[in-house]
Amino acid sequence: MAKIHMVLQGKGGVGKSAIAAIIAQYKMDKGQTPLCIDTDPVNATFEGYKALNVRRLNIMAGDEINSRNFDTLVELIAPTKDDVVIDNGASSFVPLSHYLISNQVPALLQEMGHELVIHTVVTGGQALLDTVSGFAQLASQFPAEALFVVWLNPYWGPIEHEGKSFEQMKAYTANKARVSSIIQIPALKEETYGRDFSDMLQERLTFDQALADESLTIMTRQRLKIVRRGLFEQLDAAAVL
């Protein structure tokens, strides 16, 4: 049985591709060879990670899902023994969610012996309410066969609204039973950890590539090592990974 990790969120620029890359690297760190697929019709950021051998597959035709291309995606997933990591774009969020639900894809994957794990991201700052709403939409609409992992990304500010943390918000408390794990991306000090991590993401480098790059200072690599450990330890604790 393989786990199909799908990153879904209707807001653009909130770290979806970075999360897909972290999941794929975590799998590789465990000796697995995940099948990585980028379906973002606008920004193929995930595909930019050459070390992850990401396959590009455009599943959109205008504003609609191209059902033939989606069929190709299912055919790729069906026989796999390896876990799959799929990055999806913000522009395909609504049609893809609708297509997955109306065609009962989560149940189909379960019949194949696979498990659908939806990773969604909630971010601080201006996009907080949009991303919280995106999570609530997914959790309330997807059937029980789909599992959920919520990533909290504080890059643009703390994840709190009217004094409430994410775990205290109605969107979470109403859907708590659907959430298997919450992954907290650390709030990184901007001039050190934050800059190092940002630079690595901009360059589409994996942690392994960055740590092997002798042009980076020893302390930069040390900080990246600490960030990786913090993320991977949380993924170790997430039962659905």
UniProtKB/Swiss-Prot annotation:
The keyword Transmembrane helix does not apply. Keywords: Conjugation, Plasmid. CDD domains: TraL. InterPro entries: CobQ/CobB/MinD/ParA_Nub-bd_dom (IPR002586), P-loop_NTPase (IPR027417). Pfam families: CbiA. The keyword GTP-binding does not apply. To plasmid R751 TraL. This is Protein TraL. It comes from Escherichia coli.
